[in-house]
Amino acid sequence: EWVKNAIEADKPVLGICFGGQLMARALGGSVAPGPKGEIGWTNIWSERQDLLSNGPWFQFHYDRWQVPPGGVEIARNPIASQAFIYGRSMGVQFHPELNAAVLKGWLDWGGLRDVGDDGQDPQIMMDQTVAEDPASKERTWHFAPKSSSL
């Protein structure tokens, strides 16, 4: 209820990954397992380049949302909806906050198993994250200030 009340009171909310799923469900959408998980750097297709670039963006999820009634999907890929707006709020399935330090923490706290189960090499993922970091920061700053003016 708190999430729904905040959004319906026209307070800007940014839901990241599970937070976006929580927003979708609170607003009348649904969340269910996707056809497969998404772990790692993934391209998305954005219909609102003024709000969100195509990426790549870092993913670490197994579920996906159904955009709630009144929400507008603004980005997707073949696996899942990747972003929606609802009033002044936005839900994103990916992790714009991710950098190498964050990924190291996730891997150290149990993510190594998930990455391995997904058939990926954690060192390659870390190397790609280090390489993506400058561009990822730029993409994140591109959409972050605009989120409050949706």
Regions found by a protein language model. Name each.
Residues 1, 31-32, 76, 108-110:
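Glycine-rich, phosphate-binding/catalytic loops in enzymes
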Residues 3-4, 81, 144-145:
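Short amphipathic alpha-helical segments and helix-helix/interface helices
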Residues 20:
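Catalytic nucleophile loop
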Residues 24-102:
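Pocket-forming structural segment of enzyme catalytic cores
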Residues 103-150:
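Acyltransferase
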